[in-house]
């Protein structure tokens, strides 16, 4: 059972070290997920506020006198750009979250396969 295995870093780990790495790895997953979700929530809030500004700017373009149309259109364009940027940031963070969760899932599956191959009845403690 104390057989030495090679990790993905090409360093040799004992079963105890591998088990410790497994626990450390699973402890870090929620932190990354929490971080990404926090950023997604933040960007979504900014996006929602900017959409309100966008709606206000659109009403302003419709209701303003002809002499103020160019400046109102500029405000509308700026608001549209900002709104799109927050949407893009939210999407990028969601993609990062997906990639992190997928990579973590694959890594976790590799660790579980190793543990099950060594002891087929092994069930990790909750």
Curated annotation (Swiss-Prot):
Bridged cysteine pairs (disulfide): none
Main location: cytoplasm
Keywords: Chromatin regulator, Cytoplasm, DNA damage, Nucleus
GO cellular component: cytosol; Mst2 histone acetyltransferase complex; nucleus
Superkingdom of origin: Eukaryota
Example GO BP: DNA damage response
Localization of this protein: Cytoplasm; Nucleus
Annotated function: Component of the mst2 complex which is a highly specific H3 lysine 14 (H3K14) acetyltransferase that functions together with gcn5 to regulate global levels of H3K14 acetylation (H3K14ac), critical for DNA damage checkpoint activation.
Self-association state and partner proteins as the record states: Component of the mst2 complex composed of at least eaf6, mst2, nto1, pdp3, ptf1, ptf2 and tfg3.
Name of the protein in its database record: Pdp3-interacting factor 2
The encoding gene: ptf2
């Amino acid at each position: 059972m104390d057989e030495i295995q090679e990790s993905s870093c090409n360093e040799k780990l004992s079963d105890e070290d591998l088990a410790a790495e497994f626990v450390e790895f699973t402890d870090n997953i929620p932190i990354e997920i929490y971080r990404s979700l926090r950023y997604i929530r933040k960007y979504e809030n900014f996006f929602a506020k900017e959409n309100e500004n966008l709606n206000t700017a659109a009403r302003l373009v419709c209701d303003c006198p002809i002499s103020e149309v160019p400046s109102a259109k500029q405000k509308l364009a700026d608001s549209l750009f900002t709104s799109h940027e927050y949407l893009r940031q939210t999407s990028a963070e969601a993609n990062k979250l997906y990639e992190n969760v997928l990579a973590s899932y694959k890594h976790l599956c590799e660790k579980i396969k190793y543990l099950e191959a060594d002891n087929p009845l092994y069930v990790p403690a909750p």
